């Protein structure tokens, strides 16, 4: 019995190490979000750190600040959804599809 419990604990520790490594890798993975037919593009990590915002120059000459703000927000939301999807897929690979209670993705 003791050997079985020790083996389970060892496997749990290995899983925890793999999860931590995957989280560290995801912090470097970049995803994009787009809005307005790609007139606005947001690049962020799977940790939700925004790295870049690209705005097509044509949006800057038109003077519609509210529309531009809406497009930036939509592009950020698109990037967040993509980051969450990529994170969930990567973590699922590590856990073999098990849903581990209390594990909030991405971090």
From Swiss-Prot:
The keyword DNA-binding applies. This is Nucleoid-associated protein AFE_1920. Keywords: Cytoplasm, DNA-binding. Binds to DNA and alters its conformation. May be involved in regulation of gene expression, nucleoid organization and DNA protection. It is found in: Cytoplasm, Nucleoid. Pfam families: YbaB_DNA_bd. It comes from the Bacteria. GO terms for molecular function: DNA binding. HAMAP family: DNA_YbaB_EbfC (MF_00274). It comes from Acidithiobacillus ferrooxidans (strain ATCC 23270 / DSM 14882 / CIP 104768 / NCIMB 8455) (Ferrobacillus ferrooxidans (strain ATCC 23270)). The keyword DNA-binding applies. Belongs to the YbaB/EbfC family. GO terms for cellular component: bacterial nucleoid; cytosol.
């Amino acid at each position: 019995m003791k050997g079985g419990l020790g083996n389970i604990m060892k496997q749990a520790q290995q899983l925890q190490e793999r999860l931590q490594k995957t989280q560290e890798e995801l912090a470097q993975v970049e995803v994009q979000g787009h809005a307005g037919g790609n007139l606005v593009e947001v690049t962020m990590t799977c940790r939700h750190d925004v790295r870049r915002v690209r705005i097509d120059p044509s949006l800057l000459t038109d003077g519609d600040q509210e529309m531009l703000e809406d497009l930036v927000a939509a592009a950020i939301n698109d990037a967040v959804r993509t980051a969450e999807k990529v994170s969930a897929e990567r973590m699922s690979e590590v856990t073999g599809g098990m849903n581990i209670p209390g594990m909030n993705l991405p971090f």
